[in-house]
């Protein structure tokens, strides 16, 4: 499973929130964290028979194990089909652009970004030194690949970036183009995204979790994402 080796505060926060939800059996959604805090203060029921806890689990110093009720095991941020799997993916995948506690867009995997005067061209600079859990570097190619998958004709997940109006996205989705013309890799750490019109939510839509092209793109062919649906995590 791929995780980005980056100690961002936002990811640590997501982990804490996800753990709280997981400890509650997935009953509480992230939007109900305040309610989760109340329940946690009331106490957590300990294991009925602590002797059944494996010795290896007792000795862990760097791993937290939390149970969830009904996971489907699809730990992919763009293909999960229930909230339990979403809770897990929110912990192990970091966003390109995130939100702070006031709902303001803030850097995530992206170090910074600029927007053209006409609000149609977004130049995103990645943080240097980021790697996936296998040690491979996070690059602009990975971001471009992720956005391309979301514009694939066969993509039917919950993430809809068509409203970002990326240039060439509609043609790629319709099978009229071999690539998305609005996605341009400037250098390993810089991606330029050109849109056909300004949009207030464009940055949020293109700033989601990033998939490793080397891992998730091994069998990619436009119009066939079946392999990605079965490649969990």
Language-model segments: residues:
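N-terminal lobe/hinge region of extracytoplasmic solute-binding protein
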Residues: 46-52, 65-117, 230-233
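N-terminal secretory signal peptides that target proteins for export/translocation
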Residues: 1-14
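N-terminal low-complexity, Pro/Thr/Ser-rich intrinsically disordered segments
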Residues: 39-63
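Gly/Pro-rich hinge or "lid" segments in bacterial periplasmic/extracellular proteins
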Residues: 197-233
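Sec/Tat signal peptide C-region and signal peptidase I cleavage site
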Residues: 30-36
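Extracytoplasmic
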Residues: 59-63, 91, 108-110, 117-121, ...
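Bacterial N-terminal signal peptides
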Residues: 18-30
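Aromatic- and charge-enriched surface segment that lines or borders ligand/interaction sites
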Residues: 111-159, 192
